[in-house]
Amino acid sequence: MNGDDAFAKRPRDDAKASEKRSKAFDDIAKYFSKEEWEKMKFSEKISCVHMKRKYEAMTKLGFNVTLSLFMRNKRATDSQRNDSDNDRNRGNEVERPQMTFGRLQRIIPKIMPEKPAEEGSDSKGVPEASGPQNDGKKLCPPGKASSSEKIHERSGPKRGKHAWTHRLRERKQLVIYEEISDPEEDDK
C-alpha cells in the first residue's frame, strides 16, 4: 500500500468542496455589486460566508441578532426598490428595536434586598442597603440626593482587617511542634 495515495485528495471530494464553495459565494454575491465582488479578496468572501452562516444559525436558535453590515446594505437597496409597492402598508408595520446585552443591563433595575423596619427604629421604612460598598448606611429616599455622597468614591473593606480573615478557620486539633536538632550538633 502506498502511503502517498492514502492522503491524496480524491477528485470527487474536491468537486464537492468547490460546488459548496461556489453555492455559498453565489448566496453572498447578491449582497454586493459586480465591481465590489471582483475587488474583494478570497479571504473577505470566505469571512462573509461565515458571517452569514453564523447569522442564520443564531436566528434559527431564536436569538435576536443584528444583521452584518454587508447584509444590511442589500436589504436597504431592496426595500428602496419595493417602496412604491409598500407605501400604503408602511403605516401598519411596527418597528421593534433590537435588544442588546448592554441595553438590557441598563433597563433592568438593580434589586436590593429590603430589611423590614423594626419597631422603635427611626428609619421609618427607608430600606437599608447591604454589602461591602455601603456597610449598613441608610439610603436616601428617592428624589433626594445626599450631601455626603461622592460620585467616584468606592468604600472597600476596613483597613484594619485583612481581606482573607473571613476565609480562615480554626484547626480542630492542636498541632505541637518540637524542635529537632541535627545529630552533628549533639556529638559536639
Swiss-Prot record:
Cellular component aspect of the GO annotation: nucleus
Record InterPro entries: aKRAB, KRAB, KRAB_dom_sf, SSXRD_motif
Biased composition (Basic residues): 157-170
Record carries keyword Phosphoprotein: yes
Pfam families the record matches: SSXRD (PF09514)
Record's keyword terms, sorted: Phosphoprotein, Transcription, Transcription regulation
Chain spans, region Disordered: 1-22, 74-188
PANTHER family: PROTEIN SSX6-RELATED (PTHR14112:SF27), SYNOVIAL SARCOMA, X MEMBER (PTHR14112)
Family: Belongs to the SSX family.
Name recorded for this polypeptide: Putative protein SSX6
Recorded name of the encoding gene: SSX6P
